[in-house]
Swiss-Prot record:
A Pfam family matched in the record: tRNA_anti-codon
Major localization listed first in the record, in broad terms: cytoplasm
Catalytic activity: tRNA(Lys) + L-lysine + ATP = L-lysyl-tRNA(Lys) + AMP + diphosphate
CDD domains: LysRS_core (cd00775), LysRS_N (cd04322)
Name of this protein: Lysine--tRNA ligase
Source organism (scientific name): Pseudomonas syringae pv. syringae (strain B728a)
Family stated for the protein in its record: Belongs to the class-II aminoacyl-tRNA synthetase family.
GO terms of biological process kind: lysyl-tRNA aminoacylation
Gene Ontology molecular-function annotations: ATP binding; lysine-tRNA ligase activity; magnesium ion binding; tRNA binding
Amino acid sequence: MSDQQLDPQALQQEENTLIALRKEKLAAGRAKGQAFPNDFRRDSYCNDLQKQYVDKTKEELAEAAIPVKVAGRIMLNRGSFMVIQDMTGRIQVYVNRKTLPEETLAEVKTWDLGDIIAAEGTLARSGKGDLYVEMTSVRLLTKSLRPLPDKHHGLTDTEQRYRQRYVDLIVNEEVRETFRVRSQVIAHIRSFLMKRDFLEVETPMLQTIPGGAAAKPFETHHNALDMEMFLRIAPELYLKRLVVGGFEKVFEINRNFRNEGVSTRHNPEFTMLEFYQAYADYEDNMDLTEELFRELAQLVLGSTDVPYGDKVFHFGEPFVRLSVFDSILKYNPELTVADLQDIDKARAIAKKAGAKVLGFEGLGKLQVMIFEELVEHKLEQPHFITQYPFEVSPLARRNDENPNVTDRFELFIGGREIANAYSELNDAEDQAERFQAQVADKDAGDDEAMHYDADFVRALEYGMPPTAGEGIGIDRLVMLLTDSPSIRDVILFPHMRPQA
């Protein structure tokens, strides 16, 4: 009977038996005083050796007798040789019965897949061309008490992979590569901005007023101060306070928290880049964003063509720039300018499209609802969607030519919002009025409307220079660059319901 035919109880019993056997082996090691030593220091990594000596022949390696010390987890044990894995990759280690003591040879026979060992020896190459370490000494560093998933079927259950990411990382090289890329992307973003004189800062994660975005916050209680507080939904208002204070180019890469739905594109805890630069506008940020995205694609993929599922996104071409209003007309030719400019018609169109219309929305809000329902998912290639109505952009500067819209863009790729940016509103009186309008919307039933932040208005009253700001979703960006279908694939420990 295959393991796929066994019921869960039988599988659990089998695992318990294996765990018991491994615990017996650990107990024997403890009795000898050999459990969990911490005095080994490696001098080489597995994949570094593979790269460094790729051109060395069997004869050259034999003559050079290069000594190495490696360590890693046993992923394959054939008796005469083992394959170990460290953070860089894998290498074979050869069990030489002529050079290893009998006691060591006996211990090696008791080792299991998943055990972590330390090996010393010299590099050699097999007749098949594989690089390996001919061991002169080897010992157990850590006994693995739980068996790894079956090598033929692996860890394939998606929910189990998310819950036990540590096992997922051990057995799935592509998962390890995804998170290497994530680290690489964040490091490059830092370098990209610092080269342009941006200062990295940290702003509060606990806030008395949740601001900077339209979202539901997580609430908590500060016992020492006896006050309600919120996990931040965005760092924006604090970063702009820093611009007021004289830090004219700032950025932060950190987590935001929004008490909202979970999907393949949404996680309540997610990572954002936000950056602000004085004496710039939203069009400057478009140019900067295109440059950054092209560099990241080239870094990760070696090309500005980004494959995702059955599509290819072209980062090397100029990103399309289109207003909210014009995009609705372009992708819905049955609609007219008159339809979108009549509030009753716009409300009917939004309702028919499936938007949750509450009845108090203005024309601009309704236009955005129509855009979200009828256009957003159609924006496959990179699109900068501009000129968002001021009703839905309470922190953005009004457009000089049309005060009903703002100098704002959102970047969409693959039908998903990746970035949001605008020329910042620095008129304190206008900001106060917009906060008041947001409070009225909240009182009317809009849970995502913003609170009034009197201290932020006060900061603007000291004067903020003309500024452009932007937020980029790191998780969604990494999804694109790693061809990952779900946001949970690029978050190490995504939130899950407790197991029954």
